[in-house]
């Protein structure tokens, strides 16, 4: 019996909260087209991310990847910090 490998989503977002231990909250923004008027609208999603080494800080741009559920709300883990926040 062969098992298919699940595709793990990788997304880029900005850290909006680093107050929890080993957990960061990131904001992912995307543009979607309005179905009737055609105007592009910004939509956002907040995710809780597992950060084992507490590497990411507020304002950092990070790449995260989907993983097994770590808790009730955490299903993503930090892959790397792409860009440090100014300051």
UniProtKB/Swiss-Prot annotation:
Keywords: Ribonucleoprotein, Ribosomal protein, RNA-binding, rRNA-binding. GO terms for biological process: translation. The keyword Cell membrane does not apply. One of its GO terms (cellular component) is cytosolic small ribosomal subunit. One of its GO terms (molecular function) is rRNA binding. It comes from the Bacteria. Pfam families: Ribosomal_S17. Coiled coil: none annotated. Signal peptide: none annotated. CDD domains: Ribosomal_uS17. Belongs to the universal ribosomal protein uS17 family. One of the primary rRNA binding proteins, it binds specifically to the 5'-end of 16S ribosomal RNA. Part of the 30S ribosomal subunit. PANTHER family: 40S RIBOSOMAL PROTEIN S11 FAMILY MEMBER, SMALL RIBOSOMAL SUBUNIT PROTEIN US17M. This is Small ribosomal subunit protein uS17. It comes from Thioalkalivibrio sulfidiphilus (strain HL-EbGR7). The gene is rpsQ.
